[in-house]
Amino acid sequence: NPIFGIHVFLTLVGISALAISAIYGLIYWMFAKQIKSHNLGIIYRGMPPLDQLESMGRLSSILGLVSLGFGLITGHFYAYRVLGELFPPDLKIIINDAAWIFYLLGWTIVKLKNYSGLRLSKLSFWGFIAFAGAIMAANFISSSFHQFN
């Protein structure tokens, strides 16, 4: 079914983009710490400037938010076609929907409060860690029709 394929593709692109944004956030955070201590290692000499890291992180998180959102929407429509429920009571679906809402709220706060730099990088990093941790916990806590054998 093409809807299922679109759902999987968009969801994977979204989660991957959010992971990349978290990695950019971590690099930004570590690089800013090195700059503050005036102790730049050899690894950091080839790094892009902090503002470029920040813009790459912003772009990947926006791509992740949009792609994951459309992936979740197509997943809900596919679930409705197959299961007859728009919101099946599945822990992974609930966590992904909640994570998307939290990312959307996070971006709203970033825009309203004009967060940038270190705050944005920490928010991106810890947001993804919480998201990934919740998904891993869901794998152990409950069974799901999202089993891939």
What are these regions (language model features)?
Residues G133-N149:
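Juxtamembrane boundary at the C-terminal end of a transmembrane helix
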Residues L10-Y28, A98-W107:
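Hydrophobic cores of alpha-helical transmembrane segments in multi-pass inner/ER membrane proteins
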Residues S55-V82:
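Alpha-helical transmembrane segments of helical membrane proteins, especially in multi-pass transport
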Residues N1-G14, P48-L59, L86-I94:
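Short aromatic-rich membrane-water interface segments that cap or initiate transmembrane helices
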Residues L72-A79, W100-N114:
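Transmembrane alpha-helical segments of integral membrane proteins
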